[in-house]
Amino acid sequence: MKRYTAMRSNSTRSSSSTSLKIGFVLDDSLDTPDGVQQYILTLGTWLKTQGHDVHYLVGQTRRTDIQNVHSLSRNVKVRFNKNRMSMPLPVSQKRVNELLRREDFDVLHVQLPFSPFLAGRVVRGAPDRTAVIGTFHIAPHSRLVHIANRLLHVMTRRALRRFDAVMSVSSVAQIFAEQTFRITSQVVPNTVDLAPYTRAVPLPQYKNDLTVLFLGRLVERKGCLYLLKAIARLKQENMVDQPFKVIICGKGPQEAALRKFAMAHKIENMVEFVGFVTEEDKPRYLASADIAVFPSTGGESFGIVLLEAMASSRGAVLGGNNPGYASVLHEHPETLFAPRNTEELAAMLAGLLRDPELRRKAHRWQLSEVRHYDVPVVGKTIVEQYKAALHKRAQ
C-alpha cells in the first residue's frame, strides 16, 4: 500500500513577506466549541493579525460572528468516538469547484480524518497551484473507531494523494494516522491564544474559596463522575481539614445522575453545578481554580483544555492518564492519574488541598510549559509548512 509522506518545512523562502489566502476545511459545523473548531478559529484569528486572508469551508454553520464562512453542506448529528459531532451530506462538486475558482486559495488546510462528501470534494477540486495541508486530530477510543477509520481511508485514498504536507497535533494522533491511514506526519501541537487566559482574574464569588474545578461536557468519557467519587471519599475518610468547594462547569446527559450522586453521598452542599460556560467566561472560571481536574478516560488526541487551565488557574492542573493528555503533562507524571482509580485521585487532591506550596510549584512549571503552545509560536511553524508546500508546488 502506498504511503503518503508529509513534507518537512525546509524551504528557504521568507516566512514574513508574503500574504496568503488560506481556506480552513472542516466537515463539522463551527457552531460548537469543540477542540478542532477551537484549533482552526484560534489559528485563523492569529493568521489574520499577520495580514493573511482567512476563510472557513465548513459543514452547516449558522453563526454570523465570523467573517468568510462558507457553509457548504447540510449536516446530520452523529455520535462517533464517544463524541457528539455532525457529518456532512454530499456537497455538489460543481458548487465546490465554483467556490475554489472564485476564491483562488493559496492554501487549503484540511482537518483530518475527513469525509469524502465535503472535505474530500474540496481536496479533489483544488487547483494545481494550491497547496493542500492537513492536520490530524483524532485519537481512537475503541476498536470500532479503528475499523471505521480504515474504511474511511479506503474511501478517501485518492484525495489523500493530493496532500503536500500533513501534521498531527500529538504523538498519539501521529501514530493513529500512520497505522490507520498510512500517513507519515510531523507533530505540530495544538495551539491556544494564551492572552485572555494569562490575564484572567478569579470570579469574585470564588476569590477567597479553596476550589476544585471541572470543566467539560457532562458525558461518561469526560469522567466527572470519577471526580465526584474522589470528593466523596475525601469527605467520608476526613482526608482534608480545610473547607473547599467543587465547581462543575458544563452540561450534558450525565448531569442528573451527577446531581443524584452528590446528594446520595452528602456532598451536594460543597458541589456547585454552574452549567454551560461561554468561551468569554471560561478564562475567569479557570482562573478561580486552585486545582483544575480533567479525568477523561480516553479518546483525546491532545488536551486544549489543559493548556487553557495551565495558563489561567491559580494552582495545579491534573489530567487523566490517557495518551492525549499525557502528551501535554508527561514531563511531570505526578500530575497524571488513572481516571477510574478514585482512591489515587482522592490522595492526589488531599495532598494538593493541604499544601499550597505544592500547588504553587505545579503552577510554576505549568505556566512555563504552556508558553510553548501559544499561537504566535505554533502559528509560525504552520506558516512555514504552508510556504514550504507552495515553494515545492512552484518548482
Say what each PLM segment does.
Residues 259-277:
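Nucleotide-activated donor-binding/catalytic signature segment of Leloir-type glycosyltransferases, i.e.
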Residues 287-301, 315:
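Acidic donor-binding loop of glycosyltransferase active sites
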Residues 204-231, 247:
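Conserved donor-binding/catalytic core segment of Leloir-type glycosyltransferases
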Residues 172, 191:
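Carbohydrate-associated surface elements
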Residues 276-277, 284-289:
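Short alpha-helical donor nucleotide-sugar binding micro-motif in glycosyltransferases
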Residues 319, 331-343, 350-356:
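Conserved acidic donor-binding segment of nucleotide-sugar-dependent glycosyltransferases
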Residues 149-166, 179:
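Membrane-proximal helix-turn-helix segments that form the acceptor-binding/catalytic region
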Residues 13, 26-33, 39-91:
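N-terminal strand-loop element at the rim of the active site
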